[in-house]
Amino acid sequence: MAECVVHDWQGKEAGKASLELKVSKETTAVDLMHRAVLRQQAHSRQGTASTLTRAEVRGGGRKPYKQKGTGRARQGTIRTPLRPGGGIIFGPKPRTYNLAMNRKERRLALRTALMARIEDVIVVKDFGNSLKVPKTREISDALIRLGLAADAKVLIILSTPSEIIRRSVRNLEKVKLIAADQLNVFDLLHANSLVLSEEALAKIQEVYGDD
């Protein structure tokens, strides 16, 4: 079980919170998280790259020059892969890049990644509840009050982000906002710091704490 300090919106300490999740063994943790990240990145690929072979290129019914008498190598079509405008040899075709990974492994990788970053977790009480209108400056000032550098990559995890907070965060280049049910290994490992609301922490414990 790990304990986190809870801060209020002004950055002052307001209590403690705990998180208890089962994680992978040290000997397999890195490999497990690596496979989870590879799977996530592979699933984000569209796989729509496509080229034409010499059989599919339009035209190509005539020879570029006569068979004999030129001193050059013989060629039978203007759509050979050796000529500009010709087909592509072994070019890409639409395909799926999806990688298989068991559900238990995926959930274990997620729990392991989160617990590996527990020292970088900052829990905030009533995150952004005082905002009445979207205001980017309020979010950036709050992150500074929490001790985060202005150029730090921050992942904010909320239970159900409001539209006001979404619009306040979207103009901050280094800050990413996700809901607790959008938790993923890549974002957890990519960020320098993780900012969670109390509700998001409780939801994560509820969803992943029973495994």
From Swiss-Prot:
Gene Ontology molecular function: any one: rRNA binding
Assigned keywords, A-Z: Ribonucleoprotein, Ribosomal protein, RNA-binding, rRNA-binding
Signal sequence interval, chain numbering: none
GO cellular component: ribonucleoprotein complex; ribosome
Pfam families according to UniProt: Ribosomal_L4
A single BP term in Gene Ontology: translation
Start-end of Basic residues biased regions: 60-71
Annotated segments matching region Disordered: 41-78
Composition bias, Polar residues: 41-53
Source domain of life: Bacteria
The protein's assembly and partners: Part of the 50S ribosomal subunit.
Function noted in UniProt: One of the primary rRNA binding proteins, this protein initially binds near the 5'-end of the 23S rRNA. It is important during the early stages of 50S assembly. It makes multiple contacts with different domains of the 23S rRNA in the assembled 50S subunit and ribosome.
HAMAP family for this protein: Ribosomal_uL4_B
Family of this protein: Belongs to the universal ribosomal protein uL4 family.
Protein name per UniProt: Large ribosomal subunit protein uL4
The encoding gene: rplD
